[in-house]
Amino acid sequence: MSAPPRLSARLSVLDQKKSNAPSPTSPTGLKTSLGMPPNSGSSGGGGGLKSSVGISSLPTIPSTKSTSPTLPKRNSANLSLLQQQQQQHTNKSTSPSSNTPTATSTTSPFSYLGKQASAQNLNTMMSMMMLNKNPLSPVVPQPGASLFYATPTEADDEEFEHIRNLLNSEYSVTTVQSTGALKSSNLVVMSWKNNATSELTEQDDQLENDKRDLQFIKEQLEKNNSMSKQMIYILDRFNEGLSQLEMDVAPINASMNEWSSIFNNINSTMEQVKSVLDKFDVDKIDSKINDGAKGDYVSYMLALEHVGNAIDYIAEKSHFKSSDKVMDALKQLKATGLNELETSFKSLLLKISNLVDPTTIAKLPNSKRYLAIILPNHVEEISKYIELFEKLHYNAFLKEYKDKRSKFILLSLRKMAPEKFIKQTSETKNLAYVKGSHPLISYVQETLRLYQIEYDLASELFGNQYQLILDEIIDPAHELLLETTEPIIKVRKTPGDKIFSIFPLLDLFDTFTKLLPDFITAISSRDGKHISELKTQIKHLQDTCASLLDFSLDEEKEISSSNRKEIISDATVDEISSNMINYFKRLIEYKHSVELLLKGQDNNNSNSNSNAPSSTSSNSKSSSSSSSSSSSNSASSTILPTSFIGFLEKILKNLIKYLQGRAKKDFPTQPATDFFKPPIKSVIFQINNYHYISTSLKQSKILSNQQFENNELASANHILHEFETCLDNEIKVLNSFWKTIADILITNKSNKEKDEVKSIIKKHTNFLKTFNDLNKLKFDIPDQELKLKLKTEAKNIIGRSYDQFKELCRLEKIHLEKNFVPFETTDDINRKLDRVFDSQ
C-alpha cells in the first residue's frame, strides 16, 4: 500500500507585502501560487479546500503523519466534477501562460491523483489550497488573463524563488487541525513533496534503526545482569568474611571489657582516695582561712565551703582512724572563717539597711521592688553569704539579719512622726477636712511599700523559707501601725464637731479597705496574725463610722442651745441646715463606703435580732408594754436605711421636722404682730431655710443624676420637691400676713353713712403705726434674690390696697392732713417696706 503524499504549506510572501503585516502569520489575505486572491468566509465558519487551479471542496486523503491535518472525505458523486477540473487544469497547463511559477508545482500531484483515484475510491485526494469559506459557497472565479501574461518583476522573481525554496523544504503545515476542514481566513501554499516509495523507504530505515536500538538495549541489559550477579557473589563473600572476623574478635572484646572495668574501678578508687586525702589535708587551706579574706571574699568563701564539706564527710565516715585530730582542726578553721564572714555580712547588712524617709522612696518597680533602695550587687553578695551559711549549717546570721531589717523598717517609719498624728487629729477641725489629707493615710501607704520591699527581698534571699523570717521582721512595724491607728479611731471630738468627725474616719476606712488586698499579698495570706489584726482595725473603723451616721438633729440642737439663746431673734439660715448641706456635699464623695457601712449595720441588726431570745412570760410582756414608747424611739434612731439615697431622704425629712419644731418653739409672737398667727419671725425663718436647702440641693452634686441610678432618681426628685413645696407654703403664709395688714384700710361701703371721718382716719393711723412697728422687727433675708421677690410681692399687695384706700378718700372727699402734713404717697409706703426688709 502506497503512503499518502506529504504536504508543504507556507504563507505567500506577496500577500504579506500587500497586507503590510509584521509577521508571516498575520491573519491578512493570501494569494495562491497562481496569484489568486482568497475568498473571505464568515467568521467562525470552516473554510473549504481549494487547489492552485481553483478546485473547491476536494476530498481529503488520510495522512499517516501526526502533523498532517485530516481532511473530510467526499462521496463518489463528485468524481465526474473532479475529472472535469483535472482535465481543465491539464489544458491550462499547456497554454502560453505556463511560465507562471505555479505551473510546475501543480502538474505532478494531479497526475498522481488521476492514477490512484479509481483504486483508492478518491480518498487519496488532498486539498492544495485551504480557504476560510463555507462549503456551500460558490467556487471562486478564475483569475484574469492579465495576471498570467504579465511580465514578472524583480520582486516577483524573489517571491518565486522563496516559494521554490519552500516547496523543496521539509514537509510542514502552517495551520494544524486534528479533524475537519482547515479553519483559516488565509490561503495556504501546498505542494507534493515525495512519493509513496520514498516514504516507505524512510519507514523501512526507521524500522531497521529501531531493531538495531533494541538489539543494543538487549545486549546492555544482559551485561548489567551479569555484573549484578557478580556483585551479589562478591557481597556474599564479604559478609562471610565479616562474620568470621566478628567471631575472632569476640574473645578479644570480652577481654577488653574486663580490663576496662578493672581500670574504671582502679580510677574511681584513686579519685576517692584523693578526695579523702583532700579532706584530711588541712595545711592547704589553713593559711588561707587564718590570714583572713583580705578583700577576696570569693576565694575565702570557697575555702570555707571546702572546710564545711570536709567536716560533713568525716562526720559521716566515723570509721576512719585518727580522724579526731583532723576534725578538731577543721572545726577550728570553720569557726575562724565564720567569724570573718559574719563580720563582713554585718557590714554589708548595714549598707543595705541605712534609714530612709519613706516618702522619698521612688515609685516601686513591678518586680524586685527592693531595687528602689538596694543596689543589685549588694543583693548578690548577701545571697552568696546566706547560701554558704546554709551549707555550713550556720544559722546565727538569721538573728542578725532579722534585727537589722526590722530596725530599718521601724526607724524609717518613725521618721514620719506617727506619735504626732493623734494630736493633729484632735486639733484639726473636721469641718475643714480635705479628703486624703489625714497623715495616717500616708503612713499606711508607706508602711505597705516597705512591706512590699521586704517581701521581695526575703523571697529572693530565702526562697520558700521567707515566710517565718518576714513575719518576725515586720512585727515591730506592724505593732507601731496598730498603736497609731487605735487612738485615732477612738478619739472623741468636741460636741459641736460630732457630725463632721466621720469624714477623716471614712477616709481611713476607704484607705484600709482598698489596701487590704495589697497587705495580704505583701505579708502573705499564711500570716494569719498580722492580717487578722488589720481586719480587726477595719472592723473598728466600720463600727465607729456607722455609729457616727446614726445621729439626731435634736441632740445637735441641745448641744448648741447655749449659743442659740444669744441669737434667738435670728431668723436667717439655721446652723443645722448649713451643716447638713455641707455634710452631704462631702458625704457624697464617700457614697460607696457609706453604702457598705449601711449594709453592714443592717446585717448586724438582723443578726442581733435573730440571736435575741424571745420572752414568753407575763412579766416580760408587762415590762415591754410599759417601755414601748422609749424602745420605739430608740429603735427609730438606730435603724438606718441600706442605701445612700434612703439615708439622705431620712436625714432631710428629719431636718424639715427640726425646722418646723424650732419655728414653733424659738419664735414667740411679737407685740407688733400679735394680730397675726403664726409669728411672722418663724415664717421668715422657715422661708430662709427652705430656700437655702432647695437652692443648695439644685446647685450641688448631692442630687446629681451622675450620683444615682435610674431607680434612685425618683426618690432624689421627691426630696427636692418636698422642700420646694414647704417653701411655697411659707411664702403664701407671708403674703397672707401682708394682706392682713392691707385689710386694716378696708372700709365697709354698705355702712358708709354710719362711718364717720374719724373712723377712716383711725384706720389710716393704725396702718401707719403697724408699719412703724414692723420697722423695729427687721426681716433678715440674706439671699438677695429671695428678698427682692418677697419685697415685690409685699409692695404689690400693700400698694394695691393703699391706692384703693386713697381713691376712696378722694371720692368721699375725706382729707387726712394733720397740721398741714400732706397725704402719704404709695412711694412713701414702699420706702417703709424697704426699711422692713433691710437687715441691721
From Swiss-Prot:
Subcellular location(s) of the protein: Cytoplasm, Cytosol; Cell membrane; Midbody, Midbody ring
Coiled-coil segments: 193-227
UniProtKB keywords: Cell membrane, Coiled coil, Cytoplasm, Exocytosis, Membrane, Protein transport, Transport
Single GO MF descriptor: phosphatidylinositol-4,5-bisphosphate binding
UniProt entry tagged with the keyword Membrane: yes
Recorded GO CC terms: cytosol; exocyst; Flemming body; plasma membrane
Chain intervals with Polar residues compositional bias: 19-31
Comp. bias (Low complexity): 50-73, 83-111, 603-637
Record membrane topology: Peripheral membrane protein
PANTHER family per the UniProt record, alphabetical: EXOCYST COMPLEX COMPONENT 7, EXOCYST COMPLEX PROTEIN EXO70
Family: Belongs to the EXO70 family.
Subunit (UniProt): The exocyst complex is composed of sec3/exoc1, sec5/exoc2, sec6/exoc3, sec8/exoc4, sec10/exoc5, sec15/exoc6, exo70/exoc7 and exo84/exoc8.
Function per UniProt: Component of the exocyst complex involved in the docking of exocytic vesicles with fusion sites on the plasma membrane.
Protein name: Exocyst complex component 7
Organism name: Dictyostelium discoideum (Social amoeba)
